[in-house]
């Protein structure tokens, strides 16, 4: 069981994965009594895409092994169908690049992140779009990200994302700076969340947001 807001977010994330254009088909397995029912999830995905989607409930199918057998068979059928697809050219304006952290150390903000930011700028300049994830890792550098906002409204939204996340953690008695940087980040030479954030935001390049 879960609170409604978390359940809704879980569904949105799963639907987002399923609708990703890099995914040919979807096989969903559920227990049968969870707060995100596999049938409802399947129907929502089908309403948003025409890709093949099937779902199985362990309790309905008669156990785990029977469910796995059917799911594997369905996945193999989809893989065979996907192998027959032909590549098609598309306009670069249809390209959306997701930018994700790869484990930060003292060199990330000087080398790898700026390189990714340069790629982002090149693609955006050609008409593509990029998304920089992990807004928690903007904290301490969000004012620099906000400076790139194309409008005052977007500027305020960027600041609000970070403020809301900190408020959410504080309401639960947590401090985002207590767990950031991670032990691995510190072993790599980072000392504070602000330092990590200044490197993180370099991934986003310099183009207007």
Report the location of each language-model feature:
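Metallocofactor- and cofactor-centric catalytic cores in central/energy metabolism, strongly enriched
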Residues: 1-209
């Amino acid at each position: 069981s879960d609170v409604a807001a978390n359940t809704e977010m879980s569904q949105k994330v799963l639907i987002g994965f399923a609708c990703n254009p890099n995914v040919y088909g979807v096989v969903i397995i559920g227990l049968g009594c969870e707060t995100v029912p596999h049938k409802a999830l399947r129907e929502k995905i089908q309403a948003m895409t025409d890709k093949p989607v099937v779902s199985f409930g362990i309790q309905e199918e008669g156990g785990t092994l029977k469910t796995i057998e059917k799911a594997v068979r369905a996945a193999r059928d989809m893989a065979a169908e996907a192998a027959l697809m032909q590549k098609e050219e598309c306009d670069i304006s249809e390209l959306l690049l997701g930018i994700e952290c790869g484990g930060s150390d003292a060199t990330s903000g000087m080398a790898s992140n700026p390189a990714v930011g340069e790629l982002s700028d090149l693609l955006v300049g050609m008409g593509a779009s990029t998304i920089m994830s992990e807004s928690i890792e903007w904290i301490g550098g969000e004012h620099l990200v906000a400076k790139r906002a194309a409008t005052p409204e977007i500027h305020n939204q960027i600041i609000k994302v970070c403020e809301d996340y900190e408020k959410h953690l504080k309401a639960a008695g947590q401090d985002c700076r207590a767990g950031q940087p991670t032990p691995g980040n510190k072993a790599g030479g980072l000392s504070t969340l602000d330092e990590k954030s200044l490197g993180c935001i370099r991934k986003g390049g310099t183009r207007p947001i």
